[in-house]
Amino acid sequence: MLTDPDLKSKVDQIWDKLWTGGLSNPMDAIEQFSFLLFLKRLDESEDDRQRQARLRNQDYKPLVPPEIRWREWTNKEAKDALEYVRTKVFPWLKEMGNEGSSFKQYMQGAEFKINNPRLLIEVCNAIAALKISEQNQDVQGDLYEYLLSKLSIAGRNGQFRTPRHIIRMMVEMREPKPRDRIADLAAGTCGFLVNAYEYILETHTSPDILYDDKGQKQLIGDLLSPEQGEFLQKEAFTAYDNDSGMTMLRIGSMNLMLHGIEHPRFFYMDTLSKEFTDKKSYDLVLMNPPFKGKIAEKVVEGKPEDKSANGKRAKQSAKGKLDLGLELPTNCTKSELLFLHLILRTLDMGGRCAVIVPDGVLFGSSKQHQEIRHKIVEENRLDGVVSMPSGVFQPYAGVSTAVLFFTRGDTTNKIWFYDMEHDGFSLDQKRQPVAENDIPDILTCWKNRFNPDFTTQRAERLSELKSEIAPMKAERLKLLKEINRLTFENAIAPADDEPTRLALESDRQRLAQLHEQMAPLQAEINQLNRQFWVTKAQVKGNKYDLSASRYRQIEQDEPYYESPQVTMERLLKLEYVMAEEVRKLDKLFN
């Protein structure tokens, strides 16, 4: 999500310029913005490539001809710049890429639609002012997400961009390798593949050159062999999408190229259809499939087709079953379940997966829900489940989700769970950075989940914290009891009964101080309890329910309850006080 208010303001200005400059179709505005942003990033990436070649002691071979670079034409007069872009820059851009690359394929029908010379220069200056290369994170996907939010389509059909920190968490937990064949079967802007590539480069860059003088990462990949480097460029990454349209296919291909994948393999394909035949093709699948609900409504008698939930036509066979791909159950219409079947089909034996699913997949009681959970647990190895809070996909959706980590083949013995409560951002629509963040702990726990020393240290720390907080909890109960008594006494006491009021105020202040002392201890206890293991027998006994809330044991603070005897005594005393007040009133009137 784009959280920097200054960046938001600058993007708003670009949007307004394009809108008022004649691009009345919002998707046209986004596409033209994308082309210019891509050209700017290409210019910056040339500087990066030159620096990396120097670090590797290699010859520098320019990817972008000098006459095409941003700095060459943006300094021209507006009219000359527009003509230059039309006749030289954009034709080169359309032919950029290797034969067979998805970028070159999708650019063939692209048009440069900015016709106002002044608008071109104003937008270019505004893009330069974004200073994306100086950001401490890749904000390009955030920019697209923010622009798409203006169209109110970012969450259409349940499809919305996965936050970058969630993608990075999933990638780090699955640890992509240089020889992995990696796929995203519903790719959007290809964020998962970009992060997988960056992870491989980072883990194969010499530690002494990984960071520059400013502390920024330099993803050189100098430890990769030439064969590994060529494989990463030409074969490792494959993406599919059919929901986002041609503009997003171009954006996804540009995103891959900007991050160093010069031969993007991003294809327009409905991966749930019969046309998609991949089987045992990938070593790693990373994805966040769209949560559309039903693929198609009930078949109407006599009609060979029926509209799906998103308004598209879904092919039906003569018997009224969905015309789905190989080995996909024709009695299932929920896309989130079908994608899980598809992942299992496309993974090679031993292949790994990290996939985001809506919570309903974890506990749904339908036959189709139970069947896919049974298949993952009994016929494969379910490695882990990370339950995520409902605000992770704000502002586009408040749906609760989880990440499933499983491996094709083998069988499940026990399952690692983590019940995430904080992801480093507020869980409202603003999604502002906050201090509470479980992701570092998730990564640490995952990497050490089979380490007995780590488990012992964590258990010992939990025991220490419980011992430290126990007397505070006991004092808390005593204070609650005294506050309860003083509150009653203060309510029935004369107005000038100062000692009771002061005693009550003092105890309330002490309780607030106690809560402040307990808060960090309780927060650490809660975090230590968020990781736990569940056996296959437990899951099987609960109809393969994978909800963290079903198995996590949460210790609740002992509540304070006054005894019935004291409550009755106070009621009698209150009745007596009220009767006395009534007698006093009666004397006043008589």
Question: What annotation goes with each model-predicted range?
Answer:
Residues 29, 226, 232, 240-244, ...:
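Conserved Class I SAM-dependent methyltransferase catalytic core
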Residues 2, 296-335, 359-368, 389-396, ...:
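Short, contiguous acidic/charged loop-to-helix segments that flank catalytic cores in large enzymes
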Residues 3, 10, 25-29, 119, ...:
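Helical mechanochemical/support elements of P-loop NTPase systems and associated helical scaffolds
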Residues 352-364, 383-437, 441-445, 453-460, ...:
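Substrate-binding/catalytic lobe of Class I Rossmann-like enzymes that use SAM or dcSAM, i.e.
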Residues 12, 230-234, 262-266, 317-322, ...:
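Short acidic (Asp/Glu) and glycine-rich catalytic loops that position anionic groups and cofactors
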Residues 1-178, 264-273, 387-391, 413-421, ...:
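Non-catalytic, mostly N-terminal accessory regions of nucleic-acid modification and defense proteins
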Residues 4, 137, 145, 243-250, ...:
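S-adenosylmethionine
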Residues 159-287, 291-303, 357-360, 368-379:
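Conserved S-adenosyl-L-methionine
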